[in-house]
């Protein structure tokens, strides 16, 4: 079993227990992709679900030996809810581990939104931050898309990933699903429009700045990569365009 497969397995167990899951359509050619790189197979697998309040729950898992392991796990709410996104980027490269966990806010600087979705998880963040050293600087342009409870760390030991990071991942996911259970739909037209704009802004940023783009291009080529990013990983823009045609 790879380093991040237990994370995905636990996520699926938690999601199955707490949500009414249904399959989310994965475009042809994206469920599994394989390339031979320097004599070693690099395999990318995709899984996805949806639920009554969550538009897309999806995971991209990359396995290329012990020095290349990635799990990108993102939950996108339906446009009728002002829920934050759930984001987990778990990356192991030859240079070490890079871990990012957060509930990315739609309206980061809105005090009412912070009180609703960020302040309740600050104690959880503080509890895990005590054992996971801050990972250092990250791009200034990314700051609007992360909450004050953003857990960003570069563990030196794989054992830390298997224990401390795993525990943080499960706790953050359960806390997010607590928010989902309590979420009520937005009904005011202005509020719905604001939610859609905020979701599109976040997903556009993620698609344009996806740090995996270079890796995927090297492994699978630019055409497959761009279609994978825009047609599956961050697909809201594409889906909205299809609806309005």
From Swiss-Prot:
Belongs to the HY2 family. The keyword Ribosomal protein does not apply. InterPro entries: Ferredoxin-dep_bilin_Rdtase (IPR009249), Phycoerythrobilin_Fdx_Rdtase (IPR022827). The keyword Oxidoreductase applies. GO terms for biological process: phytochromobilin biosynthetic process. It comes from the Bacteria. This is Phycoerythrobilin:ferredoxin oxidoreductase. Its EC number is 1.3.7.3. Coiled coil: none annotated. Keywords: Oxidoreductase. HAMAP family: PebB. One of its GO terms (molecular function) is phycoerythrobilin:ferredoxin oxidoreductase activity. It catalyses: (3Z)-phycoerythrobilin + oxidized 2[4Fe-4S]-[ferredoxin] = 15,16-dihydrobiliverdin + reduced 2[4Fe-4S]-[ferredoxin] + 2 H(+). Catalyzes the two-electron reduction of the C2 and C3(1) diene system of 15,16-dihydrobiliverdin.
């Amino acid at each position: 079993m790879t380093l991040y497969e237990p994370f995905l397995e636990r996520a699926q167990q938690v999601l199955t227990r707490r949500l009414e899951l249904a399959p989310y359509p994965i475009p042809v050619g994206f469920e599994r992709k394989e390339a031979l790189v320097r004599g070693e197979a690099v395999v990318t697998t995709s899984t996805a679900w949806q639920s009554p309040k969550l538009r897309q729950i999806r995971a991209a898992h990359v396995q290329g030996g012990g020095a290349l392991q990635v799990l990108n796990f993102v939950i996108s709410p339906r446009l009728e809810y002002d829920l934050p996104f759930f984001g987990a980027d778990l990356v192991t490269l030859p240079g070490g581990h890079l871990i990012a966990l957060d509930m990315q806010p739609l309206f980061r600087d809105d005090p009412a939104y912070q009180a609703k979705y960020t302040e309740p998880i600050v104690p959880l963040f503080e509890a895990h931050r005590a054992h996971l050293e801050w990972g250092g600087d990250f791009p200034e342009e990314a700051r609007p898309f992360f909450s004050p409870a953003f857990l960003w760390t570069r563990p030196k030991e794989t054992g830390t990933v298997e224990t401390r990071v795993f525990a943080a991942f499960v706790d953050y996911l359960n806390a997010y699903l607590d928010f989902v259970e309590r979420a009520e739909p937005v009904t005011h037209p202005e509020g719905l429009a604001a939610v859609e704009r905020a979701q599109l802004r976040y997903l556009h940023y993620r698609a344009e700045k996806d740090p995996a783009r270079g890796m995927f291009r090297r492994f699978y080529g630019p055409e497959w990569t761009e279609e994978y990013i825009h047609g599956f990983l961050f697909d809201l823009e594409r889906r909205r365009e299809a609806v309005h045609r």
